[in-house]
Amino acid sequence: MSDPITLNVGGKLYTTSLATLTSFPDSMLGAMFSGKMPTKRDSQGNCFIDRDGKVFRYILNFLRTSHLDLPEDFQEMGLLRREADFYQVQPLIEALQEKEVELSKAEKNAMLNITLNQRVQTVHFTVREAPQIYSLSSSSMEVFNANIFSTSCLFLKLLGSKLFYCSNGNLSSITSHLQDPNHLTLDWVANVEGLPEEEYTKQNLKRLWVVPANKQINSFQVFVEEVLKIALSDGFCIDSSHPHALDFMNNKIIRLIRYR
């Protein structure tokens, strides 16, 4: 049995065998480790490859097993495909093509489920009436929560590109708030009467906007209308069994489906 070989791939170290690296002789790795191509070394004497080290684990596992094993929430398909092209592991390239066709079919049929919650709470704040003169005030504030689940990761990304939080006078995309590729939780408030703009920032109160309409979402009715526009344009339709179509705008749980 040959001695282990340690690779430095983009700063990540992997240890494997010569037999594994040459298991596909026509690949770039097969050529590198059969002496047909020169190899570079790092300062520790490890074989250095200036490529992405994170996804190389999936390439190495394929060399070991001839099977493509990816986690269910894998989000680096484009990167992995480019790396497979670089290493020229043809069976892996074909396996990735089959996987992408499978994912594409799964994306066509989809479900969208939205759970809405609303409450009213009192917010306390200070108001500057004159230089060095402040008064305490309070006002009722509507707080909204929406839990969104979709079997289509692409739709949630589309939705995330349309909705923005307003905080500290700036709009920021909600895509950074994705819990995972299939879940999104939104929390925001309506405009509060008499609340100074700086208090929204001080109390971490976010408002929600939809673009490109540049419309602030101050009620669930507006939220549902805007999400519905986006969903219908992406092929979704209202699930006739839940809720009843006549009561759609007033329901706290909304379900849409897509068949293609």
From Swiss-Prot:
Keyword vocabulary terms for this entry: Coiled coil, Growth regulation, Tumor suppressor, Ubl conjugation pathway
Record PROSITE patterns: BTB
Residue ranges annotated for the BTB domain, each copy included: 3-72
UniProt superkingdom: Eukaryota
Gene: KCTD21
Tissue-specific expression: Highly expressed in cerebellum and brain. Expression is down-regulated in medulloblastoma.
Name the record gives this protein: BTB/POZ domain-containing protein KCTD21
Pfam families according to UniProt: BTB_2, KCTD11_21_C
Protein species of origin: Homo sapiens (Human)
Coiled-coil spans in chain: 88-112
Function field: Probable substrate-specific adapter of a BCR (BTB-CUL3-RBX1) E3 ubiquitin-protein ligase complex mediating the ubiquitination and subsequent proteasomal degradation of target proteins. Promotes the ubiquitination of HDAC1. Can function as antagonist of the Hedgehog pathway by affecting the nuclear transfer of transcription factor GLI1; the function probably occurs via HDAC1 down-regulation, keeping GLI1 acetylated and inactive. Inhibits cell growth and tumorigenicity of medulloblastoma (MDB).
Example GO BP: ubiquitin-dependent protein catabolic process
Subunit architecture: Homopentamer. Interacts with KCTD11; KCTD21 and KCTD11 may associate in pentameric assemblies. Interacts (via BTB domain) with CUL3; indicative for a participation in a BCR (BTB-CUL3-RBX1) E3 ubiquitin-protein ligase complex.
InterPro entries: BTB/POZ_dom (IPR000210), KCTD11/21_C (IPR045763), SKP1/BTB/POZ_sf (IPR011333), T1-type_BTB (IPR003131)
Pathway where this protein functions: Protein modification; protein ubiquitination
A Gene Ontology molecular function term of the record: cullin family protein binding
